[in-house]
UniProtKB/Swiss-Prot annotation:
Gene Ontology cellular-component annotations: cytosol; mitochondrial inner membrane; mitochondrial matrix; mitochondrial outer membrane; nucleus; perinuclear region of cytoplasm; synaptic membrane
Stretches assigned to the GAF domain: 177-312
Native source organism of the sequence: Caenorhabditis elegans
InterPro entries: GAF, GAF-like_dom_sf, HD/PDEase_dom, PDEase, PDEase_catalytic_dom, PDEase_catalytic_dom_sf, PDEase_CS
Biased amino acid composition, Basic residues: 789-802
UniProt gene name: pde-2
GO biological process annotation, one example: positive regulation of egg-laying behavior
Protein name: Probable 3',5'-cyclic phosphodiesterase pde-2
Residues involved in a divalent metal cation 2 binding: D463
């Protein structure tokens, strides 16, 4: 029999095992201890514990003997409790169940001091977190150092569970990577405690749950457990360490958690992670030590957990800061590129007051599919973009506000970044080709006006805010760019960003050119813009290529929504690749810009430790081979399909075939001279270009003629405007407001303007009557002035004309003035 005696009261009744189990499940005041000391009578806080008759024999046996009849005297360390009755009851239950089926050996370590901020500051050096820690060890009390794990006093070894400060240094260096930090923590804990497995849980304070970490990937699995669920929940809710010798007998043990790691637990120790602010960070569970976890392990974990908790807290804080930065970057990505750029009022009014122009104003060949639009100069891009909407009739049909359209064009041009290829000049070239296609009879019959308007707007904005990188670069996990975070789940990262920028522009009050449309039509146009901008992704085109071929072979059906969608995607892709369907000189210069952009991305990837593709590596890329392969697989089939649908665009198919032959000839010229291809300078060699034409001419004279066709002056991606002879310019009656004016308009120099005025004065002297009817004011015309004032002829002109007619006298009847209506009526009345 086990006898328990108090100093001033008789022995109390022993609680039943059922009561023990209930108290354990409630967790209110259950304080077990498995630490064993040497035999002898010991006073424990006012209570003396005696053993049975066999106590003397069992003094040298290990603690936790399975025999229920063998007991020994047990000495417990002083407990920090004010309620002695609760402590005595818990000790009774522990001793009563020793060696029975309810003996699961749990130790809720209440004898470990409360983790307070002052205590943690004593343990951690008072230095900034970024400063190197120099203190080699953490001091411990002598009472804690003298810790025994053996019951035999002669075999006892004094251990010092000291934690080197270098471990904390190592943890702090990994606070920028939570997964690597936890991996290092677990490795250190397993090495010092000889545990076989582990589990890590982090505290979700918002949802009051514990989130499970994955052992292999060291990432959050998403599996969550409520506070109080299982041993982990018990440790988290009480913030106490639990050392369990036999988990099969523990009422809190739950196999569901261990099944996540395929662990067959025998014993474990679970300890909370509490930071310097006494906040719960998480729980770490170590499994399956050979002889169970000892008191020495608990002392080590007590000190070790302080370092772990603060390191993980700093890592979580760093992760939260990084998430905030990512959100800020996302907001910046949603901002319109060039939004901070100031659009001058004078620039807006220049476009608003600019008269309607015919396409011949820019060049006689401006409406030719083979004409390189960049040759008109960047100072004409805005004016030509306005002309596209006017020429197709969209301004009148949809009542587009000219000021808002002007602001939209200026804002779109500011939204393109100064990258080598995907810049504002590329957008203008794509829009020019789309305009040529939309004004053909085939497309007018095949697509509706709203679809054509959507295509024109989409071409103008299709690469806005392009970064000069590819989709694959944006989606690389090493980069973690904000664009990939926003759009990686849907694919076509850059194209979706371009569409988002376009919609933000159209929703601005200053750019809302579609404000007069009904809501249904506006949604239709927006959806069409989205689909065709996404179609500029080459991978998306390759997925639709077979469907387009089937549509052409079966015959285009304008009533089919799918056929109209495929046709718009084809027009958009052809417009995006239209630079390769011009003359070879233009194609070469554009290819140089493309590879400058590719090489810049390749250099960036090398800096990030990523091996770039061969065509993006400036040391290994061979441009002719890449271009030949691209034209053969993508470029030539696209324009062959377009020529099948749009007969007026057959010249584009012939041009890209001729350019393909020229690239083959260029490959033959430079292949034997590797040193010449180290840079892109050979793409500008005029002598090499002439030799290429000679090679192609021997093979196909027609292809050589098409490839060598030049429109002078040609400035690919240049800013020099086209300088045509102003006086010899003809509009053939299309530009009604500028028939008499000059082709240069406001962009002509003052010398040219004076030359025009002097010529007009000379002409006015030869015919005074014509001069009166066609007065020139500042290079303008009477038609322009009459349009500004109204459709009526100014009274001063009629007055001057009457004076001239009345003063005229001639003997020739044919030259005499005709009688007025009043004179005719008076003569008839007199008769």
């Amino acid at each position: 029999m086990l006898e328990l005696r108090r100093n001033s009261s008789p022995s109390s009744a022993h609680p039943s095992p059922q009561t023990n189990c209930q108290n354990s499940q409630r967790g209110d005041g259950l304080h077990h201890h498995h630490h064993e000391a040497a035999s002898g009578s010991t006073c424990c806080g006012g209570m003396t514990v005696f053993t049975g008759a066999n106590a003397a024999k069992s003094s040298n046996e290990p603690a936790g003997s399975a025999s229920p009849t063998v007991w020994r005297k047990t000495s417990h360390p002083p407990l920090h409790f004010n309620n002695n009755e609760t402590r005595n009851r818990n000790l009774q239950m522990q001793l009563k169940n020793r060696g029975t089926k309810d003996d699961w050996g749990a130790s809720l370590r209440y004898d470990i001091e409360e983790p307070t901020s002052s205590g943690l500051l004593e343990l951690l050096p008072d230095v900034p977190i970024v400063r190197k820690l120099s203190r080699p060890l953490v001091k411990m009390d002598d009472q804690d150092d003298a810790c025994s794990v053996a019951s035999n006093e002669s075999d006892r070894t004094v251990l010092s569970p000291l934690v080197p400060m270098s471990i904390f240094d190592q943890f702090l260096c990994l606070t920028n990577n939570l997964s690597a930090l936890i991996s290092c923590i677990i490795a250190e804990a397993k090495k010092n405690t000889e545990a076989e497995d582990y589990a890590v849980f982090l505290h979700d304070e918002d949802n009051k749950q514990m989130v499970l970490f994955n052992n292999e990937t060291m990432l959050m699995t998403g599996k969550k457990f409520d506070m109080g669920y299982g041993i982990v929940g018990k440790v988290a809710s009480t913030m106490r360490t639990m050392n369990i010798r036999d988990v099969s007998r523990c009422p809190f043990f739950n196999e569901e958690i261990d099944e996540q790691f395929s662990i067959k637990a025998r014993n474990l120790i679970a300890f909370p992670l509490i930071d310097s602010s006494c906040s719960l960070i998480g729980v770490i569970v170590l499994y399956n030590k050979e002889n169970g976890f000892s008191r020495h392990d608990e002392k080590y974990i007590k000190r070790f957990s302080y370092f772990v908790a603060n390191s993980i807290a700093h890592a979580i804080l760093a992760k939260q800061i990084e998430e905030v930065r990512t959100r800020i970057h996302m907001v910046e990505e949603f901002k319109i590129q060039g939004e901070d750029a100031v659009i001058e009022e004078v620039d807006i009014m220049r476009l608003v007051n600019d008269p309607l122009r015919d396409w011949r104003y820019f060049s006689q060949n401006f409406a030719d599919f083979s004409f390189p639009p960049r040759s008109v100069g960047e100072n004409h891009f805005h004016r030509a973009s306005m002309m596209f909407f006017e020429d197709l009739g969209f301004s009148m049909l949809y009542k587009l506000n000219k000021r808002k359209l002007s602001y939209l064009v200026l804002r779109v041009s500011a939204g393109y970044r100064p990258v080598p290829y995907h810049n504002w000049s590329h957008a203008f070239a794509v829009t020019h080709f789309c305009w040529l296609t939309l004004r053909t009879d085939a497309i007018r019959r095949a697509l509706s006006d709203m679809e054509r308007l959507s295509l024109l707007i989409a071409c103008l904005c299709h690469d806005i805010d392009h970064r000069g990188t590819t989709n694959s670069f944006q989606m690389q996990s090493l980069q973690k760019t904000p664009l990939s975070v926003l759009y990686s789940t849907e694919g076509s990262v850059l194209e979706r960003h371009h569409f988002a920028q376009t919609i933000k522009l159209l929703q601005q009050e200053e750019c809302s050119i579609l404000e007069n449309l009904p809501a249904a039509d506006f949604r239709t146009i927006v959806n069409t813009i989205r689909e065709v901008i996404l179609a500029t992704d080459i991978s998306a085109h390759l997925r639709k290529q077979e469907r387009i071929k089937t549509m052409i072979s079966e015959g285009y059906n304008p009533m089919s929504f799918d056929h109209r969608y495929l046709l718009m995607c084809l027009v958009m892709t052809a417009s995006d690749l239209s630079d390769q369907a011009k003359n070879f000189h233009n194609a070469k210069r554009i290819a140089e810009n493309i590879y400058l952009e590719f090489f810049a991305q390749g250099d960036l990837e090398l800096q990030l430790g990523v091996k770039p593709l061969e065509m993006m590596d400036r040391t290994n890329a061979y441009v002719p081979t890449v271009q030949i392969d691209f034209l053969f697989k993508i470029g030539v089939p696209v324009f062959q399909l377009l020529a099948s649908v749009v007969p007026e665009g057959r010249t584009t198919s012939e041009a890209i075939d001729a350019n393909h032959l020229c690239w083959v000839a260029l490959d033959e010229e430079v292949r034997n001279n590797p040193s010449a291809t180290n840079t892109l300078e050979y793409l500008r060699d005029e002598n090499l270009e002439r030799r290429i034409y000679d090679r192609v001419r021997k093979q196909d004279p027609r292809a050589a003629e098409i490839a060598s066709k030049r429109f002078e002056p040609v400035y690919a991606n240049g800013s020099v405007p086209q300088t045509q002879d102003i006086l010899d310019h003809r509009f053939d009656g299309y530009d009604k407001k500028y028939q008499i004016g000059c082709s240069g308009g406001q962009n002509q120099s003052n010398g040219k303007q004076q030359q025009i005025r002097s010529l007009q004065k000379i002409r006015s002297k030869t015919s005074e009557d014509d001069a009166l009817l066609k007065p020139m004011d500042n290079g303008g015309s009477v038609a322009a002035s009459s349009t500004r004032r109204g459709s009526r002829t100014p009274r001063r002109l009629w007055r001057r004309a009457r004076q001239l007619i009345s003063s005229m006298s001639s003997s020739c009847a044919s030259c005499s003035p005709l009688p007025s209506r009043r004179q005719v009526s008076e003569d008839s009345e007199s008769c």
